[in-house]
Amino acid sequence: MESRNWIGGEWLSPSGEEMVVHNPSDLKEEVGVVHFSETSDITQAGDAAQLAQAGWAALSPAARGVYLFKAAGLLEAALPELAELASREMGKPITEMRGEVMRGVHLLRYYAAEGVRSIGTVIPSNEPGVLQYTKRIPLGVTAVITPWNFPVAIPLWKIAPALLCGNTVIWKPAEHASLTAVRVAELFEAVQLPPGVLNLVIGQGNRIGDALLEHPVLDAVSFTGSTATGLGIAERCARRNMKYQTEMGGKNAAIVLKDADVAQAVAMIVSGAFRSAGQKCTATSRVIVEQSVYDTFTEALRQAVEQIQIAPALDPGAYLGPVASAGQYEKVMSYISLARREAEILAEGGAAAGTENGYYVRPLVATGLNSSHPLIQKEIFGPVMGVVQADDFEDAIRLCNDSIYGLSASLFTRDLRLAHRFLDEANAGMVRVNQETAGVEYQAPFGGLKQSSSHTREQGQAALDFYSAIKTCAISYE
């Protein structure tokens, strides 16, 4: 398979550099070739998006929703093939990837239905004979910049509400999810989305990112990726007074109190930490355990981690597959080397047959660290987790909040009073009791505090707030 751009309703081959894509589960397998774009492709995509925007906005929300509904049906029909392609491209275990594609189906249907929801408000006027109300209007041309770790769900939870609100989209996916992105765009072509409403531009951020962010037709940006890049995007958008949304890093904590159901806590924490090889912004990367239950919990955790099944992504039994790329592998292994030098290794998963030729990283749990250590403070984005002790609930909350990030946090307890205190006191955008830090539902707002997110939210009704502006209308009828 070879990547292509989809601009103005036409499939075009970029003229930039090429990258051969190898299966991270088996580097001997060539999955396809990615052709990178030049800045001229961004210019073309921006022009196409601007040309299409007025006509798209003129359709009713219900009419725009029909396209999303049709795309959902095609996505569901393509689920097996698309999930396999994504697993081969970026290494997510096939069972997880199938679930992600199905989440994309649900997202499309959810936002399609929003096309007939009543939105806006009627506001009483101080003057007689005046009707005053608000309505939502499109922003215009929106840039959607997406990561490789959720190559289907994240693009769709941005693109679907953007389109429903009447915006046109320039979509730049991550390099390591480019082939999957092409297949997703083909589904929108198949439902006969009007030319220029969605434009796919494959490219490297350091080559075409500036051209995209500086394009004069751009009205908004939605980004998911690293904190450093996100903060840079926020600064550039602010200079143009342009609406932006940045979902960035996380160092998510799970607190285990002395009255917790240890078996439940271990199962949830292992899932939160090691599913997707820890390559989630919501992954559990810190565990804070009350001192009196520390030994019991860590022994159960050790046993669970040592039993994790590592296997190629297409193996239905794979709990943990490879990390996505050589860069990811090198970064994660550098933190594992740090752990071996400066921490105590509580648990480490075993190697598995058939994993010699891929980017496999054995899951690792480190202890013996203070709260300021890089393994406790830095986002690793891999199957590495640190465990620290807390004296009591108050100490656990202090440790939980001791981070530049504030995306997600969880607490395991049977104490309802402490559960509610945690929901109030944990400084994170998503707080969960007796659940893992990952797994927020699509109909709920998604986002964090501090350096994890901008001051907007994705998914649910909150996404419609971002992708639209409020216009206040008044008419005198006397």
Model-inferred region functions:
Residues E29-G32, L218, I255, Q309, ...:
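Conserved C-terminal structural/oligomerization subdomain of aldehyde/semialdehyde dehydrogenase
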Residues L12, R109-P124, E306-I310, E344-A347, ...:
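Proline-centered turn/helix-capping motifs that create local helix->coil transitions or kinks
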Residues M1-D26:
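Hydrophobic face of amphipathic alpha-helices that form TPR/SEL1-like repeat modules
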Residues V31-S37, A52-A58, V144, A254-L257, ...:
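Short, well-ordered beta-strand elements within core beta-sheets of diverse protein domains
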Residues G9, L27-E29, A49, R64, ...:
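Residue-level signal for inorganic ion chemistry
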Residues A228-N370, V433, Y477:
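ALDH superfamily catalytic-core signature
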Residues G120-Q264, A390:
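Rossmann-like NAD(P) dinucleotide-binding subdomain of oxidoreductase/dehydrogenase enzymes
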Residues L27-S118:
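Glycine-rich loop-to-alpha-helix module at the N-terminal edge of alpha/beta enzyme cores
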